[in-house]
Each structure stands twice: as C-alpha cells, then as structure tokens.
C-alpha cells in the first residue's frame, strides 16, 4: 500500500519530555520515563500508522559527554538517528532553561544538513504566559531556522494530532510492506529489560541507577495459557550496591519486581511470572563484551 512514509528523530537534552512525547504519539508506554537523566539508552524505534501514513519515530538518548563505553554507544545512537531521519523534532521544555546541551544538539542538527526541523515546545502549560514561549522560540531561531513550531503538552496529549499532521507535510509517498513493519518491531527482551530498568531508576538511590543494566536470562510464553515466564538479572557494578538493590529482607527487589510485573501485564495483557536476580559485573560499562551482551552496539 502506498502511504506517506518517513523517519522522524526526536532529539533534545535529557529530561525535556522526549519519552513522554513518543508515548503520547503511540498512546502506549514504549519508552521509559524517569526524573533522572540517561533513562533512554537505545534509540527506540516505534511505528505510527494511520490510513494515509506510516511514520517511524526514533526516541534518542540524551546527548552528554562520554565517560565510558556505554556513553559512547549513547552518543553514537544519536548520530545514527540524525543520519536516518527525514524529519527532526527538536524538543525544548519550558520547565528548563536553555543550556550548552541545547546548543550542542543544535550544532549536530546543523552538521546533519537536515532541512525539515520542527521545534517542539514541550510542557507549554508551565509557561506563565505566551510571551515566555515566544522569547524561547526567538532565542532558538537565532541559531537555527525551524520549518514549524508546535507547542504541546505530551502529558495531557494536547496538540499531538497537530504535530503529527505537521510532520506529514514533510514525508514522501512510498510502498509500506510487511517487511517494513517487522523491521521496526522492538524485541520483547528489550521492552522487558527497559521496564525493569525503569523501576530501578525510580526506586534506587542516586549512586546506583546508571550503573544498572538488565539481562533477560529466560523468556517463555505459553500461548494456550496466556502466561509469560521471565527470568532476568539486574547487573550492577559494585558489590556495595547489592544490598541496596536487594533491600532489607529482599524488600527492594520485591518492590521492583512487582512494579515491573504490573507494567508488563498492562503492556502485553497476559499473566506475567517475573523472577529477578542481582549480578555484580565490576565496571561493566567499560567492558565491551558485557555492554554488547546487554543489547548495546559499540561504535568501532
């Protein structure tokens, strides 16, 4: 079937609402949301499809200075997203002041030579008046010319349809095949791992979360019983973090497991049996083999 087709990269510094935006577009939870930076590790690809369009949305990790091999992976994911994109959404949140991170991303956009760049003003409801939003747009327009500016509230799903219709103006017509759809389907293991990691980010102390990875050890689905048995391991960098993750009498690991299980049940609409273990891999973010085993690609 011929439809308007294209790839849209959602970019911006950490915690400006990129994950909330893609979740609002898809009307389901596909990208983890937390008040801590680096909560989106992979460039998550999700397909939006309606009667006349098929759009791949790529939710990128936030750009930041690399301090280990995992950080290099994160920044590489951003570069790939820019290269593939037909349209770039630059997200600027009204609850955050402009910073050097914003302008570094703008420079990356300019280096990519992409013409179809849309400024998305997120959390527009936070601004006390329209003048503050206009001033933000004016500041950013000094550095890059945007094709359009859309004010949204992703949390309250305001102007999301307007944004989608604006994006469609910059798409080309192409044949959409089953292969195209299959190509962008995320692996279940990735969704499960990110769901567990979100609960780690939400519940653990600040010194632990970004040294946390999640490995899916076993995944068996019984279609007849609509029952999914999952065994996973939370990977941490230091032995001293293990008691924190497990908690007193196992209280913390139980809390993480119960919350993740509830979330997975809502996503997959099936009975979930989830068992989580804790493993220590010293400095795993510096170990290529471990980083790759957790599903992250390393830039050579």
Swiss-Prot record:
It comes from the Bacteria. The keyword Kinase does not apply. Its main location: cytoplasm. Residues 38-42 are annotated as: G2. Residues 59-62 are annotated as: G3. GTP binds at residues 12-19, 59-63, 122-125. One of its GO terms (cellular component) is plasma membrane. InterPro entries: G_ERA_dom, GTP-bd, GTPase_Era-like, KH_dom-like_a/b, KH_dom_type_2, KH_sf_prok-type, P-loop_NTPase, Small_GTP-bd. Pfam families: KH_2 (PF07650), MMR_HSR1 (PF01926). Residues 122-125 are annotated as: G4. GO terms for molecular function: GTP binding; GTPase activity; ribosomal small subunit binding; small ribosomal subunit rRNA binding. Residues 204-282 form the KH type-2 domain. It is found in: Cytoplasm; Cell membrane. The keyword Membrane applies. NCBIfam families: era, PRK00089.1, small_GTP. An essential GTPase that binds both GDP and GTP, with rapid nucleotide exchange. Plays a role in 16S rRNA processing and 30S ribosomal subunit biogenesis and possibly also in cell cycle regulation and energy metabolism. Belongs to the TRAFAC class TrmE-Era-EngA-EngB-Septin-like GTPase superfamily. Era GTPase family. Monomer. PANTHER family: GTPASE ERA, GTPASE ERA, MITOCHONDRIAL. This is GTPase Era. The lineage of its organism: Bacteria, Bacillati, Mycoplasmatota, Mycoplasmoidales, Mycoplasmoidaceae.
């Amino acid at each position: 079937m011929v439809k308007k087709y294209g790839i849209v990269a959602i970019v911006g510094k950490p915690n400006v609402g990129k994950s909330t935006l893609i979740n609002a577009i898809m009307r389901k939870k596909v990208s983890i949301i937390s008040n801590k930076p680096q909560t989106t590790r992979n460039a998550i690809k999700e397909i939006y499809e309606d009667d006349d369009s098929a759009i791949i949305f790529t939710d990128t990790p936030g750009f930041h200075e690399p301090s280990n091999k995992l950080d290099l992976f994160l920044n590489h994911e951003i570069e790939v997203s820019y290269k593939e994109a037909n349209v770039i959404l630059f997200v600027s949140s009204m609850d955050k002041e402009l910073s050097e991170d914003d302008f570094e991303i703008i420079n990356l956009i300019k280096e990519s030579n992409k013409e179809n760049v849309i400024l998305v003003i997120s959390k527009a409801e936070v601004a006390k008046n329209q003048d503050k939003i206009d001033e933000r747009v004016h500041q950013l327009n000094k550095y890059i010319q945007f094709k359009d500016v859309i004010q949204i509230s992703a949390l309250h799903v305001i102007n999301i349809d307007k944004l989608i219709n604006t994006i469609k103006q910059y798409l080309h017509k192409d044949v959409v095949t089953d292969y195209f759809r299959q190509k962008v389907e995320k692996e279940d293991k990735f969704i499960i791992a990110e769901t567990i990691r979100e609960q780690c980010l939400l519940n653990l102390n600040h010194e632990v979360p970004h040294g946390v990875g999640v490995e899916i050890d076993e995944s068996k689905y019984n279609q007849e019983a609509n029952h999914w048995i999952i065994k996973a391991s939370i990977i941490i960098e230091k032995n001293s973090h293990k008691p924190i993750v497990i908690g007193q009498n196992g209280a913390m690991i139980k809390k993480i497991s119960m919350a993740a299980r509830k979330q997975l049940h809502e996503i997959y609409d099936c009975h979930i049996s989830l068992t989580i273990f804790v493993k220590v891999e010293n400095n795993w973010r510096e170990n290529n083999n471990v980083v790759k085993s957790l599903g992250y690609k390393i830039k050579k």
